[in-house]
């Protein structure tokens, strides 16, 4: 079997490309950062931030006949910069492909470079790639979605469509784009590994959709009642975009907003050109959704989208408040609470202050940790420990009129749900 190297194969789009290649009989090698873990079967170690020269790609390219680059970041953070991820590393890879006669398929993005650094850097590499003496195909998709999952902005749009009673619609919702199913994009990429004239191909469905129509179709597919919309005023939308840009988090940033405002449309005749060149028809959204009925899990994912941050930040505030209370409560009050129990001989004031510091650290950790699951697990352990220890030493806490320690019975499964939901990949 011929071997394909997929860069970004563990991402949303890359995963579908890996699957499509395997369906067509390819042996697939996926570039992956180890992060201290054992590599899975078919993975090869690599880090785009360190593979900035052609010779750095020699091992990954051994026995490879085609490369598919689906790597990308929507915003810069720390060492993750557009220039390195979108330009320098893939250009070094492409230069290494020249001497080995390896074909190159680039997953770029449809848009205007003036929309922001994400688009500008993608298109800058596209031009550099096509200037090299190698067989190169550049695919520029519009908004990419899948009924089998979502990520980033498509998750947000699906959640807006599924909002209880009425969908939430940014502004008037009349912005036009041509969404493409991830499975169709993956099939085009897989075919492009062996055929197609070098050049740039815009990828999108045949008929442009407005944002309102896009969300309405998703709502019908999810079988959520209500056809009306609550229109979110543009100033509020712009404020949310500004906040997301400033925080460096969330599915929306200034580039995505600019792309939406400008409209994300393919060039004339692009749909027909893609079908003629690769033999793949990029389906309209309605056709894709009609092919597969929604399931309960699809509705859960859409309806839980806004509940996840609500749950997360409620837990953050609860832990920070608990920490503050543990640090500022008068020592006499703490000693009075412990009087007559086993805690009286265990320096209860010191225990309360220590627990307060721990709660503050856990609350801050959940708020800012890039990988929050270990923090949530620590919270689970601490709540279970509090319930067991204080339940044994101060059993009267379970009998307080307002619940007191008894509320930990509900808090434990809530933290278990949060542990599952905070992992967005």
Regions found by a protein language model. Name each.
Residues 191-254, 266-308:
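Mid/C-terminal beta-alpha module of Rossmann-like enzyme folds, strongest
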